[in-house]
Amino acid sequence: VAEQAKPMFELVYFAPGRILISTTPEGNIQAIKADVELSVENKDVVIIQGNPVITAQGFDRLNKLAGVSLVMPSRIDVPGHGNQPNPFFILDPATGAIRFVMAKMVGIGYSPVGNLVIVDQSLLFDLLSYLKMDAIAKIRAVKGCGKVANKSTLSEKEKDWFFIPILDENYGICLDPLHPEFINIIKEHTQRQRFAERIALGILKRNCLRHHPAIGIMNVQLGEGGKCKVPILAWRKDLGMEELRKIAEDKSARAG
């Protein structure tokens, strides 16, 4: 009797669910297909303006199965500064604090059809822009903590307020430094400066994973209990760290 052909995927149960695996003739795992559960409770998903969005933590959970390798090229081209170490920090000349973080990351992994795909992402993390967004949000939410105005319209008292230019040096955000919320705005900004590199690389990591076809998803539909399942098909084709780094450097060099 002829031996029956082995199916492409074999069903395997494990707590708390099940996966499908494909094996080589030698019995080694070649591919894994599974539904990965994400939830709001576990902070894998957050609701932004009414839409569920996968967080960096959620992408980490998906990538444990997808297996996309994230590599930082050693150098990055920075406009006005030439070729610099990656990541690169630009300081505020007036305060010496971090003003920008510029970084590049490369995601290397296999698409659902088994092709090697390289995703190259760059980021300019502008701390002042985040400060402006925080301040405007606070002005909208808390009465009396500040205003958006032209300097020429400010009262004598308001002229002593903290001013952040927006459109030009005369029009911007005015914050009352004696208001309790002012301290919260500055505290948040200080925390971003303190952890600027970590935050920037976290954003880059999420961008690489959401653009890589091994995951390729950002928004999800939540079901009961604020949970959802994301299908992942992961190929197991080992690449050494040196090979990954060479691929990343070559991709970065071609991208400029």
Cite the ranges covered by each PLM segment.
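Glycine-rich anion-binding surface patch
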Residues: 1-203, 211-256
